[in-house]
Each structure stands twice: as structure tokens, then as C-alpha cells.
């Protein structure tokens, strides 16, 4: 997941296309892609002190 976050940070236009459903991640269907984007948003928008991935 960290690799995906780094990719989104380096290529924000790719994230924009994913959010607009103009693209999807290879190997993931649209629903899985939406789940990944939600996880990214939840992580990225979280307070840096409380940022952590699930156990």
C-alpha cells in the first residue's frame, strides 16, 4: 500500500483519473480501486500523529 501512496504522490494526475473513474488499477476491479482510493484518502487526510495502517 505504501508503494501506491508514493505513486499517487508522484503522479497526482493518475490519482485524479482513478477518482474520476477514467482509469483503474491493473489487477483490480472498479470496486477494489475505489476501496484503495478511500484507504488512501483516509490515510492521507489523517492527522500525521495518528496515521497508521490497520493491524
Swiss-Prot record:
Membrane-spanning residues: none
Keywords annotated in UniProt: Competence, Lipoprotein, Pheromone, Prenylation, Secreted, Sporulation
Post-translational modification remark: Trp-53 is modified by farnesylation, which is essential for activity. Modified by the tryptophan prenyltransferase ComQ before export to the extracellular environment. The type of isoprenyl derivative differs among the different pherotypes and depends on ComX primary sequence.
GO cellular component: extracellular region
Lipidation (3'-farnesyl-2',N2-cyclotryptophan): 53
GO biological process, one term: sporulation resulting in formation of a cellular spore
Domain of life: Bacteria
Propeptide: 1-45
UniProt entry tagged with the keyword Transmembrane helix: no
Effect of residue 52 to A: Induction of srfA is delayed approximately 1 generation
MF terms (GO), sorted A to Z: pheromone activity
Effect after changing residue 47 to A: Induction of srfA is delayed approximately 1 generation
Oligomeric form and interacting partners: Interacts directly with the sensor histidine kinase ComP and stimulates its activity.
Function: Part of a major quorum-sensing system that regulates the development of genetic competence. Acts through the activation of the two-component regulatory system ComP/ComA composed of a sensor histidine kinase, ComP, and a response regulator, ComA. Activation of ComA leads to the direct regulation of over 20 genes and expression of over 150 additional genes, including those involved in competence development, appears to be controlled indirectly. Under certain conditions plays a role in sporulation.
General remark: The DNA sequences encoding comQ, comX and the N-terminal two-thirds of comP show a striking polymorphism, which determines the specificity of the quorum-sensing system in the different pherotypes of Bacillus. In ComX, the sole conserved residue is the modified tryptophan essential for the activity.
Protein name according to UniProt: ComX pheromone
Amino acid at each position: 500500500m505504501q508503494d501506491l501512496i508514493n505513486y499517487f504522490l508522484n503522479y497526482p494526475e493518475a490519482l485524479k483519473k482513478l477518482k474520476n473513474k477514467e482509469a483503474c488499477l491493473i489487477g483490480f476491479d472498479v470496486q477494489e480501486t475505489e476501496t484503495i482510493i478511500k484507504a488512501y484518502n483516509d490515510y492521507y487526510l489523517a492527522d500525521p500523529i495518528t496515521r497508521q495502517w490497520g493491524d
